[in-house]
Amino acid sequence: MHKLVLASGSPRRKELLAQLGYTFDVVLPDIEECKAEQETAAEYVLRLSQQKAQAGLALVSESSIVVGSDTVVVCDGQVLEKPHHFADAQRMLTQLSDRRHQVMTAVTVVSAEKQHSIVVTTEVWFKKLTQEEIEQYWQSGEPCDKAGSYGIQGLGGRFVTRIEGSYSAVVGLPLYETDQLLHEFI
C-alpha cells in the first residue's frame, strides 16, 4: 500500500486534495523558487512542481507517492509571484486591472518508479480596480502569500469578472487533472 504525501504547506492545496477524498500526509520541501532568465512561465512552474515533488520524495519512505504543485500568474508574458511588500502588490494588481491574464498551475506526481506532470492554464479577467480597492485589499492581508497578489477563493474573487478553465487550478490545485494523475499511481 502506497502512502500519499502532499509536498506543500499551502492550506488551499491541502483543502483541495482532501476534497478529492484522499488521505495524505504533508511535508514541507525546501526549494529555491527563482526563475531562470530564458525559462518560459510554463517551464518555470513545471520545474518548481517537479522539484517540490522530488524534494518531498526525498523526505519520505520509498513506497510513498508525492504530489508537488506550484502556481504562477502571468500578465504580458511576465511572471507575477508572491508580493514582497505593498508596492509590489500594488504594481501587480494595477497591471491586472481591467484585463485578462493567465494562471498556470503545474502538478507533479512522483514515486520511486515514475513521475508524471501536467500544466493547467486558466484565463482570468479582472474588473477595473481603483487604488482605494487595491489598498483596502492589501490591508485585509489576503494578497501577502498569493501569486499575483490575489486569491480568487477569497476577497480577491470580487475582482474576477470571468474565467475560462479550471477554477480549482487558480486556487492552487486542479482537481480533475490531479485526480487523473493520481490514478496512474494508485
Swiss-Prot record:
Main location: cytoplasm
Record-listed E.C. numbers: 3.6.1.9
Catalytic residues, chain numbering: 70 (proton acceptor)
Organism, scientific name: Vibrio vulnificus (strain YJ016)
Reaction(s) the record says it catalyses: dTTP + H2O = dTMP + diphosphate + H(+); UTP + H2O = UMP + diphosphate + H(+)
Major enzyme class: hydrolase
Subcellular location(s) of the protein: Cytoplasm
One GO CC term, this protein: cytoplasm
A GO biological process held by the record: nucleotide metabolic process
Keyword Nucleotide-binding found: no
Gene Ontology molecular functions: dTTP diphosphatase activity; UTP diphosphatase activity
Protein's UniProt name: dTTP/UTP pyrophosphatase
